[in-house]
Every structure is written in C-alpha cells, then in structure tokens.
Amino acid sequence: MAQIKYYATGRRKTSVAKVWLSPGNGKIIVNDKNMEEYFPLETLRIIVKQPLTLTETLGKYDVIAKVKGGGLSGQAGAVRHGIARALVLADPTLRPVLKKAGFLTRDPRMVERKKYGLKKARRAPQFSKR
C-alpha cells in the first residue's frame, strides 16, 4: 500500500516552501539535507519545529521540504507555514491550536520598496545646514 503523504505550500517574504508530511519517526529534510545541516542557527531550527512541538507530533511525522527564494530566516518561516498547513490536512482537529498560535496565517510583512530621492526605503540622504 502506498504511504499517505500530505502536501502543503508555505510562504514567507520571498520564500516559497513545498512541504510533504508523512507518518514516520520525526526526520526533517530540507532541500535534500538534514534540517541541522541546512539551518545552521538553533533559532531557525526552533522556528521550523514550532508547529510540531505545539501539537505534540514531533516524533510522529517525517517532513520533506523543498524551499526556494529569500534568505534563511524567510525560508524557515515558509517551511513552518507549510508544516502547519500540512498538519491541518493530516489531522483537522489541530486547526484551532495552530490558528490560535498564528501558524496558519501568511505573514504579510514584505520589504518596503526603495523610493527615488532617498537612499533606501526611508533613509534620506544626509542633510547639511551649511
């Protein structure tokens, strides 16, 4: 019999993560690497594991994620979003818990565009009175 896999997409900033969740023993693989290899910082690993830790399903599912775009922080957020969405597909009773924690909401914060006449989005050129 084919193994059940739950697929979900997660997004954060400019990163997009495709996440497959299947019953297993808790392996998390990101872009064909172990999560520990791919995310060098402990804070990023914690972010990725948050939905599993909150729902107490850390050792019950294997996660395979393919993530593109953005930096490591955005990618970690995208994987977290994808895992949370996939968990809801796997077990709809987890939805209220994940919703309350805010893991099912796409974080709308994006980089503000640079404006002409300014150095960055808000940074004005240095002003000299004399």
UniProtKB/Swiss-Prot annotation:
Bilayer-spanning residue ranges: none
One of the record's GO molecular function terms: structural constituent of ribosome
Keyword vocabulary terms for this entry: Ribonucleoprotein, Ribosomal protein
SUPFAM superfamilies the record matches: Ribosomal protein S5 domain 2-like (SSF54211)
InterPro entries on file: Ribosomal_Su5_D2-typ_SF, Ribosomal_uS9, Ribosomal_uS9_bac/plastid, Ribosomal_uS9_CS, Ribsml_uS5_D2-typ_fold_subgr
Source taxon at top rank: Bacteria
GO biological process: translation
Cellular component terms (Gene Ontology): cytosolic small ribosomal subunit
PROSITE patterns for this protein: RIBOSOMAL_S9
The family this protein is said to belong to: Belongs to the universal ribosomal protein uS9 family.
Designated name of the protein: Small ribosomal subunit protein uS9
Originating species: Caldicellulosiruptor bescii (strain ATCC BAA-1888 / DSM 6725 / KCTC 15123 / Z-1320)
